[in-house]
């Protein structure tokens, strides 16, 4: 360490901590906004699809048309594949309040993994465990793949 910095070390350390805390708050806010945006996109797609059986053909074309327009302006996050994920996200988590309480330390990769869990009770259990135990998305994915929920259920 440069001896000229020694008297400034406490203020340097404090400011570094402030920056790190601010970056963490910004990341969490952006993550929450992104997840809720994806959920709301899924909700809007579902609402549009459910607006009548006579519109079945219209509904089949909806996602490809949306994707073509949205990817032009906003990039590949709005591909047909991702729009299907957002739609499924809304179906799997129909109550946005569940998301509001859990998105602090879960990112989109966590939720994408959760979409693979067909059983609602298991999905909520995995979501809570991932949030409470700070599982990475990779750990969550592995635990889903090994049906960790079933082994915990027997304990």
Give the residues covered by each predicted segment.
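Basic, low-complexity intrinsically disordered segments
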Residues: 1-155
